[in-house]
Amino acid sequence: MAELKLGYKASAEQFAPRELVELAVAAEAHGMDSATVSDHFQPWRHQGGHAPFSLSWMTAVGERTNRLLLGTSVLTPTFRYNPAVIAQAFATMGCLYPNRVFLGVGTGEALNEIATGYEGAWPEFKERFARLRESVGLMRQLWSGDRVDFDGDYYRLKGASIYDVPDGGVPVYIAAGGPAVAKYAGRAGDGFICTSGKGEELYTEKLMPAVREGAAAADRSVDGIDKMIEIKISYDPDPELALNNTRFWAPLSLTAEQKHSIDDPIEMEKAADALPIEQIAKRWIVASDPDEAVEKVGQYVTWGLNHLVFHAPGHDQRRFLELFQSDLAPRLRRLG
């Protein structure tokens, strides 16, 4: 069984750059094994929203910490970015912080790409997935250190080389919400990323079997794949506070279709704020009792996930980190 790891999700949509760095430093001080960050050009909420650049944040945190594993959860290397430039950026960070950096990738959302110049109708999943696969292949060729000519359907390189590359390249974690990408993660990913709160059947009957199927098809051991889940948890001894803390993150409760099609934070905020608190809270583990919280988290370990990254919705993140260290972490470590 893969090693159990506990991580912290740095909420880039909620906090300004300096505070976001300090929270990751605090996460290491409170015993977390990893810290991940989303890569949004625009946040999901216009009022009070933030969107610091993920790679600047990773470098700043890397300089301030000693052992945290740092990565994106997730970045889309296929539209507003050239994947070759992303490969260069992560190779540099991999050299600066050896064995502490991974690249988490996904297929993308219109919210981040339309504003930065993508023209035409937002591509359907088939094209976005094809772009992702091609970009991962391109980046891995560059991380070999060789001189690369690449002529793909979407990207091209001519005599390209990255001169500073960490030994072994950069681990790529692939985010999936369905079995097709999960199978690809099992076949080609160093890690797999999913999110909590979507019903047991998704994990036990679709995602995890697909990861195993992909690994088997590539003659790989699934134990060698870091299986990460971003767990949405609002834990506080005050039940009312635990519930109301979820309000800021109402956009998470919009449907996937809504989130993928809306390209304006103002419109996203308007749609999200129309939701009742009860619907918003359904995406979260809302708990005031530590044993209840750990029982709900523990099911994901039972289902085969080993790297638990905790996303807390409240504005007082230091309170969450203190409560996590005292109330939840000792119980969670025993699950491993």
Swiss-Prot record:
Which keywords accompany this UniProt record? Carbohydrate metabolism, Oxidoreductase
The entry marks the following residues as binding coenzyme F420-(gamma-Glu)n, namely: D39, T76, T107, G108, N112, G177, G178, A180, V181
Q: What class of enzyme is it?
A: oxidoreductase
State the Pfam families in the record. Bac_luciferase (PF00296)
What GO biological process term is on the record, naming one? carbohydrate metabolic process
The superkingdom listed in its UniProt entry is Bacteria
Q: Any phenotype upon disruption? A: Cells lacking this gene display a strong resistance to PA-824 and CGI-17341 (a nitroimidazo-oxazole).
Q: Which residues form the active site?
A: H40, E109
The organism of origin for this protein = Mycobacterium tuberculosis (strain ATCC 25618 / H37Rv)
* Keyword Nucleotide-binding attributed: no
Q: Which family does it belong to?
A: Belongs to the F420-dependent glucose-6-phosphate dehydrogenase family.
Q: Does the keyword Glycoprotein apply?
A: no
Which GO CC terms are listed, alphabetically?
cytosol; peptidoglycan-based cell wall; plasma membrane
Q: Give me the disulphide-bonded residues.
A: none
Q: Which gene encodes it?
A: fgd1
pH dependence (record):
Optimum pH is 6.5-7.
Q: Which GO terms describe its molecular function?
A: coenzyme F420 binding; glucose-6-phosphate dehydrogenase (coenzyme F420) activity; oxidoreductase activity, acting on CH-OH group of donors; oxidoreductase activity, acting on paired donors, with incorporation or reduction of molecular oxygen
Annotated positions binding substrate: T195, K198, K259, R283
What is the residue range of the signal peptide feature?
none
Q: InterPro entries, from UniProt?
A: F420-dep_G6P_DH, F420-G6PD/mer, F420_G6P_DH-rel, Luciferase-like_dom, Luciferase-like_sf
Q: What does the function comment of this entry state?
A: Catalyzes the coenzyme F420-dependent oxidation of glucose 6-phosphate to 6-phosphogluconolactone. Appears to have a role in resistance to oxidative stress, via its consumption of G6P that serves as a source of reducing power to combat oxidative stress in mycobacteria. More precisely, is likely involved in a F420-dependent anti-oxidant mechanism that protects M.tuberculosis against oxidative stress and bactericidal agents. Is essential for the bioreductive activation of the bicyclic 4-nitroimidazole prodrug PA-824 (a nitroimidazo-oxazine) developed for anti-tuberculosis therapy against both replicating and persistent bacteria. It does not interact directly with PA-824 but, rather, provides reduced F420 to the deazaflavin-dependent nitroreductase Ddn, which in turn activates PA-824.
SUPFAM superfamilies from the UniProt entry: Bacterial luciferase-like
Q: Which NCBIfam families match?
A: F420_G6P_DH (TIGR03554), F420_G6P_family (TIGR03557)
Please give the name of this protein.
Answer: F420-dependent glucose-6-phosphate dehydrogenase
What regulates this protein's activity?
Answer: Inhibited by citrate.
Q: Which reaction does it catalyse?
A: oxidized coenzyme F420-(gamma-L-Glu)(n) + D-glucose 6-phosphate + H(+) = 6-phospho-D-glucono-1,5-lactone + reduced coenzyme F420-(gamma-L-Glu)(n)
Instruction: Indicate the quaternary assembly.
Output: Homodimer.
